[in-house]
């Protein structure tokens, strides 16, 4: 018998609440924008007020539940953006959130020694991107508030605490803190000492698909959910998206959203002496996810489209781009040269002078999407250089793949089929559904629909290949 689930999916820019069946059918969905505040004591620091976010989340849940009063909800789960933590005080109050876009620790990274050791044990560079550095930076300028921290957790497990009152963390999120030893699968006392973070603030680790318990009476009464509904632990958004697409050991998958991680799954931990990748724990911590990442990609096009093509559908824009036989400018807006651990601070459009006479707005759109395709392709090349892969296909998922032009461009550059399965644009939500089904003993039936396949162009001289050659030169000029 089918069950119905409530899924909370917290992203970086936007979040959503979905009512979904155990077969993956989305009954209803509510989206909202995430709001951040600046901390002017730092050069680049942002935070959020958990109470403000919580109100939006619960309002979204209630709106959906009220609209579908005849739907019995059996389970609740959550997906969260990585590298973000929520901090609790001694009374269990969530008083501040430090998001992935917060870089408050940057000024003090030179104080951290044994960087190679930290990379080897955590699978991550020793940079301000991760919660260990965020907490260090918080301690530097807000010592009294830092001393109030009695527990932390990730975004996805913060939702679990809202619904059950219990604070835990999933392995796929624990490794994102840079305080978790992915060899020994436990919190690292040595790394905590390096960052001067007390071990006591770190929560119990529980695996995805395990039950955190029944939802509290308070939440049940407030939202109108059945008191027997259980909260089932979710995890990191990238890993959940990969789960939805049935990414197996040896597959390569591009998860295109705010950023576009290029990932592969391995049975054993991978360590790169040149530090050209991140090694993550997969859901449950039983396998490893190796990742390269071009940085911000999807957000760039989302903002561009809102500014220049707000009333144009993706289908209409693809029709415009299909008529283009050449490019007149290149774009550079992706934010990372990943293999060199280098942020790309300068971006823009590069074209020949004087200003081209035959240029229109669609040329800019082509340039931005081509920038995303080329940036992903470079990361695909880097990943295959480290971990050889002879598959004739790549899997893809995420909202970033709404553009057919982008899909064709990636297939042409890589020379591989790009395959996307039903629900690819809602992959994190469907990943949660699969976890819930596993917990309730419901078979996760493989999709009977054929995948959407983009085949590479056999022509040796495609537009995107010509673009790539010039793009590479121009990006290096902008970021020497």
Q: Where do the model's predicted regions map?
A:
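N-terminal glycine/serine-rich phosphate-binding loop of ATP-dependent small-molecule kinases
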Residues: 1-97, 120, 148, 220-221, ...
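Active-site core segments that coordinate phosphate-bearing ligands/cofactors
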Residues: 6-7, 112-125, 136-154, 160-166, ...
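General small-molecule cofactor/ligand-binding pocket signal
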Residues: 30, 200-206, 230-232, 419-421
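Short, acidic/turn-prone active-site loops that include or flank metal/cofactor-
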Residues: 32, 37, 99-105, 174, ...
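Gly-rich Lys/Arg/Thr-decorated short loops/hinges at beta-loop-alpha junctions or inter-strand turns
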Residues: 35-44, 117-118, 168-175, 198-201, ...
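Short acidic-aromatic active-site loops that bind/stabilize oxyanions
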Residues: 43-54, 124, 128, 205-209, ...
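Short beta-strand-loop/turn "lid" adjacent to the catalytic site in phosphate-handling enzymes
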Residues: 65-100, 125-129, 156, 160-181, ...
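Structured loop/turn residues at beta-strand edges in well-structured enzyme cores
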Residues: 71, 200, 389
